[in-house]
Amino acid sequence: MQQRRPVRRALLSVSDKAGIIEFAQALSARGVELLSTGGTARLLAEKGLPVTEVSDYTGFPEMMDGRVKTLHPKVHGGILGRRGQDDAIMEQHHIAPIDMVVVNLYPFAETVARVGCSLEDAVENIDIGGPTMVRSAAKNHKDVAIVVKSSDYDAIIKEMDANEGSLTLDTRFDLAIKAFEHTAAYDSMIANYFGSMVPAYHGESKEAAGRFPRTLNLNFIKKQDMRYGENSHQQAAFYIEENVKEASVATAQQVQGKALSYNNIADTDAALECVKEFNEPACVIVKHANPCGVAVSTSILDAYDRAYKTDPTSAFGGIIAFNRELDAETAQAIISRQFVEVIIAPSASEEALKITAAKQNVRVLTCGQWASRVPGLDFKRVNGGLLVQDRDLGMVSEAELRVVSKRQPTEQELRDALFCWKVAKFVKSNAIVYAKENMTIGIGAGQMSRVYSAKIAGIKAADEGLEVKGSAMASDAFFPFRDGIDAAAAVGVSCVIQPGGSIRDDEVIAAADEHGIAMIFTDMRHFRH
């Protein structure tokens, strides 16, 4: 039989008060004596609950503006005391056993995220007593239950009811693991915050505060285990950040279909992040992390139809992302036309879900609408290390573009250039994208030489019978030689958008002028490896 421990006395001290009143009422109704501190104690007393202030229990007042509340032997002795081993010394010093500790910590992350947060504000939101109690209770989980998540309140009450007011060892052990994860994440946030301030903090006035902390502490929560990773011989799991603020594959809800695979998640992320670039109704189809068809239109149905036409062969078994609600007409078009692994959209109508339900293996995800893109960090694992950089949220406006050719682009060429520039950002380097009338007509991805990416984009367009003449071409990085321009001109490209910055820019511009091509510089590169 599981080793059970009855809960007779609980200490409650929480910054996040969500659910605490109901939980305390449930504990009190089951005969549990309540100890509490500061604001939590006042809140419980206001609700008519019998609660003893920790300062009354210890005989020692809170002091130093609340910095010292629970750091007392009567508190920590009651938590750390081993039942059946330390009973005599606890009785000698009038230490009552505390069977449950309910604590969550000062909101450090929320504090430092505020605009204008000072170092003093950050320091005052470093919890000391809370983590100490959490660690003490987790260490002594054989006898004490530590509760750090309000989402566990209901399950705890149900288990107490099923076990005559007791909790099993398995439950206490699971709660202890959550507690150590909680304090580890909390300390990591503090270390990252202070670590990024190291140069300035030590008074090196000529050196700005570091963009990246001296030691990088990462905290991710496992969302799911997977059958396997990128390949069947690799084990895998999906971890997500806590409190993600932007609609993403990590926050998406799966409303139908088989479990997502490792490759499904990677490809869905690529598709969703690409479709976020567009304000108009848009569709992005991705295969092996590369867009194989992208279009914008007046409806997502037409956008899907045009995106599919770019490369129907590659679209088979692909990932489809939209930036508008999935409607019934579009769902029917997809299901009738092709095999698809994943469809992701901000939402899906009931009628659309009835249609996709006919294909139970199709995974349908809804991620919610996004208002803006949230700056963050990108990571790339290398053997023995981690490359860290800012997320690529770089964008260029029409006003920032530089026309460097003799011929100015037409209005349509300019629209197509800006469209395919957005797409090129999400194509593996070397990336070349041909576009015409707000749809991709050829994509050359991942080639070791830029000219071959340009040639492949032209071949793709020809294979699908798409008219290249008068199209725009985007390149994610500069052209090192004129050959890429010559290849584009040979198939009818009339406008090129690229970062510029090559030592041979003059030769490349001259090639554009020779072919009557309008050339636009963005002065921004979008390598993607």
UniProtKB/Swiss-Prot annotation:
SUPFAM superfamilies: Cytidine deaminase-like, Methylglyoxal synthase-like
Catalytic activity line of the entry: (6R)-10-formyltetrahydrofolate + 5-amino-1-(5-phospho-beta-D-ribosyl)imidazole-4-carboxamide = 5-formamido-1-(5-phospho-D-ribosyl)imidazole-4-carboxamide + (6S)-5,6,7,8-tetrahydrofolate; IMP + H2O = 5-formamido-1-(5-phospho-D-ribosyl)imidazole-4-carboxamide
Entry keyword annotation includes NADP: no
Pfam families in the record: AICARFT_IMPCHas, MGS
Disulfide bonds: none
Molecular functions (GO terms): IMP cyclohydrolase activity; phosphoribosylaminoimidazolecarboxamide formyltransferase activity
Metabolic or biological pathway: Purine metabolism; IMP biosynthesis via de novo pathway; 5-formamido-1-(5-phospho-D-ribosyl)imidazole-4-carboxamide from 5-amino-1-(5-phospho-D-ribosyl)imidazole-4-carboxamide (10-formyl THF route): step 1/1; Purine metabolism; IMP biosynthesis via de novo pathway; IMP from 5-formamido-1-(5-phospho-D-ribosyl)imidazole-4-carboxamide: step 1/1
Protein name per Swiss-Prot or TrEMBL: Bifunctional purine biosynthesis protein PurH
Species per Swiss-Prot/TrEMBL record: Salmonella schwarzengrund (strain CVM19633)
Ranges of residues in domain MGS-like: 1-148
Gene: purH
Family according to the record: Belongs to the PurH family.
TM segment ranges: none
Keywords carried by this UniProt record: Hydrolase, Multifunctional enzyme, Purine biosynthesis, Transferase
Gene Ontology CC annotations of this record: cytosol
